[in-house]
Amino acid sequence: MDHVLNPEEKVSQTNSESGGADGAFQHVKGEHSSPKLSASEKSLPGNTKSPLKRKAAEPDSPPKRPRLEEGHGSLVVTHYNELPETGLEIRSQSRIFHLRNFNNWMKSALIGEFVEKVQQRTRNITVLDLGCGKGGDLLKWRKGGISKLVCTDIADVSVKQCEQRYKDMKRKSRNERIFEAEFLTSDSTKELLSEKYIDPEIKFDICSCQFVYHYSFETYEQADTMLRNACERLCPGGFFIGTTPDGFELVKRLEASDTNSFGNDVYTVTFEKKGKYPLFGCKYDFSLEEVVNVPEFLVYFPVLVEMAKKYQMKLIYKKTFREFFEEKVKNDEQKMLLKRMKALESYPAAPNTKLVSGRTEDYEHAQKMVENGQIKLPLGTLSKSEWDATSIYLLFAFEKQA
């Protein structure tokens, strides 16, 4: 795989055919303009003035919160607890094998970038993995040479699997020094982690929250509690990093749809209605190939930026997956990692193998590159359906101010 098909190359070709309406990595137009909000939706419950100004000025001690209902948290727990463990052989046969690897590569590049930043001031790195799942990022932290990792998730089965993965990794490491680890089952949208740490005074250099934070936007209280858990124990100069669906992109695609749903054969997003998008509790159902629907909530990113100021957090960047990919793929080390992780599919398919998508139109962008005759084969790409699915996400990074 000597040439990596850049999404921008794909977009430019797709746009030339479709008039630029639906490129796989198209930017949201008018990104700084908010989705349509009713007057009542521009305020949070109990506020008579701008909620964002009020939140930024709130004291460090949180206000007394009303008792929250169970909400959708139990659905999320059930969903992730019931996901079966599958081996590499089974995963490699999946329609979204390369898509999953691509998203995993994005996390690797993001985590690696900020571990390097922290290493410039300390080698004794402590990390909070907020929404650790089954431990998919353990090897990334091992590669980063961190000293301590706290893993927490709402799903108890996932936390147990994460802990077992850690024990297996440590057992196989022989003489290699492996970071210490702590495992907590907790709903980080409703419970304070600071009351559960083994070391009550622990401080973190990095909090990583991958494909999880959007679950907290069910209510302001939940989003604020999760943000507090992510940020309140960060050292000055520490980072809160993560990946989350891009609310602007989701709304743009919904508004362009004739129904309350959009997607393709890989993913589907379904909203209850269109036209009004409250700041919190804007629920939609997201389904990915081979994965049952699970409710998620729209994240209006400017609100997150304002809320983070309460915890002395400053946004240092927000990038779409397209932007981040274009930046990182220029790095030879990241490009090699992309290949090792099988994050892109080889095109044309190798002898005696098939492309993951049977639809010819899914590879029109790659075929055009081949027809140009100016690249060395095979090239690395994703099917158009997979590019469309992964392009709903963005990456973010906040820094704790002194």
Swiss-Prot record:
The keyword Iron does not apply. It comes from the Eukaryota. Its EC number is 2.1.1.56. S-adenosyl-L-methionine binds at residues 107, 131, 153, 187, 210, 215. GO terms for cellular component: mRNA cap methyltransferase RNMT:RAMAC complex; nucleus. It catalyses: a 5'-end (5'-triphosphoguanosine)-ribonucleoside in mRNA + S-adenosyl-L-methionine = a 5'-end (N(7)-methyl 5'-triphosphoguanosine)-ribonucleoside in mRNA + S-adenosyl-L-homocysteine. Residues 1-75 are annotated as: Disordered. Residues 35-50 have a biased composition (Polar residues). Residues 1-11, 55-72 have a biased composition (Basic and acidic residues). Catalytic subunit of the mRNA-capping methyltransferase RNMT:RAMAC complex that methylates the N7 position of the added guanosine to the 5'-cap structure of mRNAs. Binds RNA containing 5'-terminal GpppC. PANTHER family: MRNA CAP GUANINE-N7 METHYLTRANSFERASE, MRNA GUANINE-7- METHYLTRANSFERASE. This is mRNA cap guanine-N(7) methyltransferase. It comes from Xenopus laevis (African clawed frog).
